């Protein structure tokens, strides 16, 4: 038996009601399209006990980078290195960010525009700094990261 159904069975047999939901962070006040699975149990309750509250508290629209951070990046478009070159890499601040990963690479000199990129690689399009990426992950501006560049990038990528 797969792990999740087995875990749910054990929890339910212990008397818990369970709410399971996949939430997109951009509907929860985070300027990033990042889906995450949540499973919450409450003793002596019915299944789905939090469904109504979760749905009621979701935003009616996705949070954009601009809504969250304004024009603090000083550019309308920015580069985020794609997992593969089959994916776009240039994003607009007027949309939720793609998932922030634990790597932050510069724009390759040989980068060719993907058909879904929001702009050409040109003057003003740049990679985000580690600090800017941390803001998208909702770290407060005064948060100070300690450690190597690799460790800091990994911490930023693993947040949210």
Cite the ranges covered by each PLM segment.
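Class I S-adenosyl-L-methionine
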Residues: 1-99, 103-105
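C-terminal target-recognition/interaction regions appended to catalytic cores
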Residues: 70-160
């Amino acid at each position: 038996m797969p792990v999740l159904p087995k875990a749910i069975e054990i929890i339910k047999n212990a008397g818990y009601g369970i709410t399971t939901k996949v939430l997109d962070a951009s509907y929860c006040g985070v300027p990033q399209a990042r889906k995450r699975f949540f499973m919450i149990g409450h003793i002596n309750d019915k299944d789905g006990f939090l469904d109504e509250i979760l749905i009621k508290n979701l935003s009616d629209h996705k949070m954009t980078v601009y809504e969250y951070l304004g024009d603090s990046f000083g550019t309308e478009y920015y580069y985020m290195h794609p997992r593969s070159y089959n994916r776009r890499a240039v994003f607009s601040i007027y949309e939720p960010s793609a998932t922030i990963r634990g790597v932050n690479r510069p724009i390759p000199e040989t980068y060719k525009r993907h058909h879904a990129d929001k702009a050409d690689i040109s003057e003003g399009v740049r990679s985000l700094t580690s600090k800017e990426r941390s803001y998208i992950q909702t770290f407060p501006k005064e948060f100070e990261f300690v450690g190597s560049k690799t460790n800091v990038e990994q911490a930023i990528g693993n947040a949210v």
